[in-house]
């Protein structure tokens, strides 16, 4: 099973994330003292979440902050938004949101409020369903809310699990 699921919980460092800045380095360590016992283990047996051993260096602004949007497809699929920043090769996940009402105005405006909260400069929108319609809807709301956010459309052509691993 370990080969089938190459992304492990232990590969992630779990800590509170500042919305605007981060340290120069986050030091990972698999010391049992760093296991976060309060978080449920949802992976393979023996796989745990760990807190950082140290946060090192100066704190400064993130290099980039994006919002990645995966619009709902068919059936019970949800629209998902992930707010991510990066600095010095580290990716910081601020928040993830999921919406059951597709890409309604309320959903898109809520996603844009999150963009404002975290200082997002780019929306990355998956175009597999709708052929770009979601990006057009976002453009309308960006204009109405006077937010200066670039939009990048991407087409996913591999399994969702593989895309997540590649992004990390």
Predicted regions and their residues:
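Gly/Thr-rich phosphate-binding beta-strand-loop-beta motif of the actin/hexokinase/Hsp70
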Residues: 59-86
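Generic structural signal for beta-strand residues in well-ordered domains
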Residues: 58-59, 74, 116, 144
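ATPase catalytic-site recognition across NTP-hydrolyzing enzymes
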Residues: 1-69
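Mg2+-dependent endonuclease catalytic cores in nucleic-acid-processing enzymes, primarily RNase H-like
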Residues: 82-168
């Amino acid at each position: 099973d370990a080969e089938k699921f190459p992304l492990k919980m232990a590969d992630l460092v779990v800590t509170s994330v500042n919305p605007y800045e981060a340290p120069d380095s986050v030091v990972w360590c698999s010391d049992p003292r760093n296991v976060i016992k309060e978080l449920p283990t949802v992976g393979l047996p023996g796989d745990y979440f760990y807190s950082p051993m140290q946060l090192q260096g100066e704190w400064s602004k993130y290099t980039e902050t994006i919002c990645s949007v995966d619009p709902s497809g068919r059936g019970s699929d949800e629209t998902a938004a992930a707010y991510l920043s990066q600095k010095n090769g580290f990716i910081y996940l601020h928040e993830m949101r999921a919406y059951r009402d597709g890409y309604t105005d309320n959903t898109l405006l809520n996603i844009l409020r999150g963009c404002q909260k975290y200082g997002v400069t780019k929306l990355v929108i998956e175009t597999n369903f709708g052929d770009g319609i979601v990006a057009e809807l976002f453009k309308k709301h960006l204009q109405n809310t006077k937010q200066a956010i670039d939009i990048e459309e991407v087409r996913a052509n591999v399994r969702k699990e593989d895309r997540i691993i590649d992004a990390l």
